[in-house]
Amino acid sequence: MSVQFSMKFPPAVMVSGYDIIEDVDPIQGTHMMCFEPVLEEGEGSCKVLSLQELKMRAIEINGELGLRDLQSILICGGLINLSETHRIIFPGTILERRDSLHVPYMDCNGAGWSRGFLSLNEGFSRFDRFLCLC
């Protein structure tokens, strides 16, 4: 099943604090990007990254977790198969919350989309691999 969709990305920003996180919408913003899913991993520009790889790529920027620069390295989309569940991360916006960096994510499954925020300093339950366009 081929699905084409588009999403808006906010400018890369770092948000401090706890209360405003719920007001940040990872799919609203000024940067429009369109993704056309590929059928198999390795085709096109889709790559599966592990949590460790994601951290390593972030840490490589100036020796620390990159904030604005991370957007230029990882722009996320992925393989869309509505019969499976995929977690897609959006590192263009990174949130600082209680000394932990968070990135927005969306889960795609047969029931539709859900979204939230992931901490780069914590485990991601059963989602230990992420679909990213590099």
Q: What do these predicted ranges mean?
A:
Residues 1-63, 69-134:
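A binding-site-centric feature that preferentially detects glycan-recognition modules on secreted/surface proteins
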